[in-house]
Amino acid sequence: MTHILIAEELQHEFKRELDYSTYILGTIAPDAVHAQSDFRVEQKERSHLFAEGLRWGQIRDEKDSQIWLESIKNYYLNNRHKYNIDFLLGYIVHLLADVYCSLHFYAPFVNGIDGNYEEKMAQFKRENYCVNYYFFENFSKKKNLDDILRKGQPITLKGIISKAVIERRIEQLLEFEFKRWDISHIEEQKICKIKDMECLIQGASLFIKKIFIDDYYLFGR
């Protein structure tokens, strides 16, 4: 849900009329690889446009972030006229949000783990599901995510992600990640706190506006 909320924060910054549903579908698409039965981390690196030599979960400094960022910008510049622009913008927003989150949230968390690594990662995953469901519940008071995603137009990005996998991801989100999670103890979470995640959404939105929309999107249109 954080990616969807970041995309919503930015939708009017593009100064063009967007097909909202396709834009939102684009922003959940990079993680569609999780819906593949033979999922491998290399598939996620490809869908997230990792430059050669970068590894998922190991973007922990400014140098790696900059290499990843340039790969994303170059992909946009080279493909902006080849694919549905609403879908592509949503896709790029997701990737740029991950660049920001890797450097400002995930890396500090991983680097600061003191104790059992596997236990902390399991706690992170569990808390992340809960906070996403919390945001989903709030979002659902005004909008129907099921309808939005099904109205969007999925596309295949050649060599990156397929339309069929994106369609499976919609089902996976609605049947698992956004099922009813017990969030009665969400205020006690230690890693993925609501306030911190809200700050992350705002920070990522400002970051994307500055380094892509203001400085690159208009130039690259």
Predicted regions span which residues?
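N-terminal leader/auxiliary helical segments
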Residues: M1-R221
